[in-house]
């Protein structure tokens, strides 16, 4: 089996999106996680991420991790995925445990899997440009079998709410070593990192399943074996609640801070070309992205259309919600 055939894609879609809750209220006043919303009236961010993954991995190896409590949102959105490719997290215990759940689930099916992770809350203006980096990432995993390869983005400005990658020397495959990784630094440190040509961490990354498992074991300890036991077929059949019971005991652990930041020597980075990438984590970033879209549109969108709070498929329109709140304020 060749390397491409063993590459899996996982869309990270289990977050609550609390920082964007002001824009994601449904008619009942409940906050809908942003990945189940549309940026500007089209498909949901989750559906966009699934399509992004399918440009680099086969549909049969495209997975998503979701939260059990969001089932009413993701059941319809993920109807095109095989049921076994929907990895359900009992509750949120941080991205490190979410990544671990994905790795163990995939390695059970493919012990030599290479896995690419893509967040479900990104907007990309030029998808074809990012696809080049995703293909490069998939290829690079053969050259970094024991570490993690990240996709970095040249920053527009200092932003303390993102992670930063300080690249090192260039390697034979075109990727670069990582001299330093800093997750969500203080504002003065973010300023300094941008001056030093650091890259934003897109949180799009890839690694072999065994390499990820080894790094996670160093930081999560016995939780790795406990989760592997809970996921074993015979345990699932005898005690379906075993995984949920384990999650009740797990602490919340952030993958970027507790795993990626701790092992810079095991990291590689690929710099994405200019592609209009945005992490839609805050209302400010939503507003900036919508402004760019309006400026670059060949035909201006009528204001009445931009203010429609729901898409034709019943999704919350983040751009419209932001515009309405701005007018109300």
Question: Which stretches of residues belong to each language-model region?
Answer:
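Conserved N-terminal catalytic core of the sugar/cofactor nucleotidyltransferase
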Residues: 1-14, 19-26, 30-33, 38-131, ...
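Left-handed beta-helix
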Residues: 1-6, 207-329
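Structural motif
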Residues: 9-10, 61-63, 85, 114-116, ...
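Hydrophobic packing residues within well-ordered alpha-helices of enzyme cores
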Residues: 20, 74-75, 190, 212, ...
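A short acidic, often aromatic-flanked loop/helix-cap motif at beta-alpha or helix-coil junctions
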Residues: 44, 92-97, 157-159, 187-188, ...
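Conserved core of the sugar-phosphate nucleotidyltransferase
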Residues: 58, 126-250, 267
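A conserved hydrophobic position in a structured secondary element of the catalytic/binding core
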Residues: 66, 118, 185, 207, ...
């Amino acid at each position: 089996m060749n390397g491409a055939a063993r590459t899996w894609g996982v869309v990270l879609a289990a977050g609550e999106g609390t920082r964007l809750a002001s824009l994601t209220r449904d008619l009942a006043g409940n906050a809908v996680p942003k990945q189940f919303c549309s940026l500007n009236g089209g498909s949901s961010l989750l559906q966009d991420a699934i399509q992004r993954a399918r440009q680099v991995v086969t549909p049969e190896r495209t997975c998503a991790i979701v939260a059990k409590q969001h089932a009413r949102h993701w059941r319809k959105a993920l109807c095109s995925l095989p049921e076994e490719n929907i990895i359900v997290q009992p509750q949120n215990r941080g991205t490190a445990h979410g990544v671990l759940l994905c790795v163990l689930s995939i390695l059970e099916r493919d012990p030599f899997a290479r896995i690419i992770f893509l967040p479900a809350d990104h907007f990309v203006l030029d998808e074809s440009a990012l696809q080049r980096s995703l293909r490069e990432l998939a290829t690079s995993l053969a050259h970094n079998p024991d570490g993690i390869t990240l996709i970095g983005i040249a920053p527009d400005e200092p932003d303390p709410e993102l992670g930063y990658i300080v690249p090192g020397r260039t390697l034979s495959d075109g990727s670069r070593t990582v001299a330093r990784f800093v997750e969500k630094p203080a504002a003065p440190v973010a300023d300094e990192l941008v001056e030093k040509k650091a890259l934003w961490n897109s949180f799009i990354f890839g690694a072999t399943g065994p390499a990820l498992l080894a790094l996670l074991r160093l930081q999560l300890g016995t939780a790795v074996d406990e989760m592997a036991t809970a996921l074993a077929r015979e345990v699932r059949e005898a005690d379906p609640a075993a995984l949920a019971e384990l999650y009740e005991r797990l602490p919340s652990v952030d993958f970027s801070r507790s795993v990626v930041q701790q092992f810079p020597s095991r990291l590689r980075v690929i710099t994405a070309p200019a592609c209009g990438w945005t992490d839609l984590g805050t209302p400010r970033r939503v507003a900036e992205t919508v402004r760019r879209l309006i400026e670059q549109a060949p035909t201006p969108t009528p204001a009445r259309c931009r203010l429609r709070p729901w898409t034709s498929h019943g999704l919350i329109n983040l751009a419209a919600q932001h515009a309405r709140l701005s007018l109300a304020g």
